[in-house]
Amino acid sequence: MNLSTKFLSIYLYIFLISASFISSIIEIPLYPIKVKGIPKYENISISEPYDPNNDNNGITFIEEGNTFMNANKLFLAKIKIGSQGQEFNLILDTGSSILWVGRNTCGGEHTLIHKFNPSTSSTARNTGQYFDMKYGSGACNGFYYNDYIEYIPKRRFNMYFGVADTANFKVENCDGIIGLSKDYADERLSFIHMLREHGNTDSLVFSVKFESQEFEPYAQGVMYIGEHSDFSKKEAVSVPMVFQANKIFWACELSSFGLKNNDYYSHSDYETNLIFDTGTNVIILPLKYYQDVLKDLTKFGCGSLLSNNGYQIFCGSNDTLPDFVFKFDRHNFTIPGKYAFYLSSSGVYISSAIFQESGTFIIGTPFFFVFHTLFDAYNDELKFYPLKNGVIQSGSRKLSTVAIIFIVFGGIVFVVGIALIIYFSVKKCKEKQNKNIIPDNIGEDYYGLYK
């Protein structure tokens, strides 16, 4: 083997190793935390119609510090930042776009445990670019930094992230956020775009599922960078994304939502968007649809009508818990009741659904316990694979009015075309037959000629 052949072999070997690494699946374990200090509902009463100025008939909030069911969890990823490897536990959040931690001098009403000290990292650099983020559970602001981040053990990458000078963040036992939404004002600062830039994946694809992991005994969830083999199976389904003004969330078009058990199924048709948010531990419904849910829960034995026409919501046992059913694209996704309800400290089950004033549905961690969900920023689609307790029922695709018109028009043109072809073919055959027919008197003419 000559020298050039050796160099070629070495080059091919390095290329194949690099290609296999880039295309391989990277696993990041996720760890659950109990969500405290967030209002939960027990013995809910709501007037109909809802009057926010009427304290007597409004919503009653209580603090359920002991609540700890499957649905009542958020999930953390462990990372290290800086030359000294300062450790942080960050909430995985597909509802925002940037990674941020608190500065060591961070002020505000926050419960951040670990804070970043730029002075102890020789590689930290303040970019001077300001950021301001708002969440349902708080807000933060500060400046973007550039430093090494280790989210894969023993591998560091130079990345941008936010360092908060002020944080009003009410979720306990965490140090910040890993934002994984599709886009932001500057793509260079989006975490998932930085993953691709550093060659960790050959496309803007990652997936999330919340269940016990064999490779990490204390983890109860995992994030995969790259496309997992689940999504090549026949049970997996794809749904196109929809885009919202100003900012792109991971969202699809919701066509209906309802509750069901073995004997009863109640649902309503909607035309709105459904946002998938790993940073939310509940199912959030628009207010006008939440009232429908309150009515339906009484039909399942999970509530009663009050004298003021409000509703008192409770579930006495696990047997009475209805399933939540979401329909988007042409698929019904069923979340079992044990994931859609909390068990309160007083022994009653509380629906994990809450309401907000806007017209958008937000589905949180209950969904990811039963569906392995893939976020594909390259093809602008979401993919879902049912886990142990998840059910996907696929129906026929709903066609738009324009598509129906085209199909009907095309069908008419096709039928008319076939009819014309048959007509002219028959006509041509008849004309040909008429030319080949011998007249009855032709023998008499010839006889007279030779006579």
Annotate each language-model stretch with its function:
Residues 22-38, 51, 162-167, 225, ...:
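Aspartic protease catalytic domain
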Residues 104-107, 184, 229-231, 289, ...:
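Acidic glycine-/aspartate-rich tracts in secreted/extracellular proteins
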Residues 61-63, 69-167, 173, 296, ...:
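Signature of the N-terminal lobe/flap region of pepsin-like aspartyl proteases
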Residues 23-70, 150, 155-269, 347-353:
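Aspartyl protease catalytic domain
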Residues 4-24:
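Cleavable N-terminal signal peptides of Sec/SRP-targeted secreted and luminal proteins
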Residues 273-302, 306-310:
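Extracytoplasmic, non-cytosolic globular domains
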Residues 79-81, 88-92, 99-101, 177, ...:
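Short hydrophobic beta-strand that contains or immediately precedes a catalytic carboxylate
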Residues 77-81, 133, 145-154, 208-210, ...:
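Short conserved beta-strand and strand-loop elements enriched in small hydrophobics
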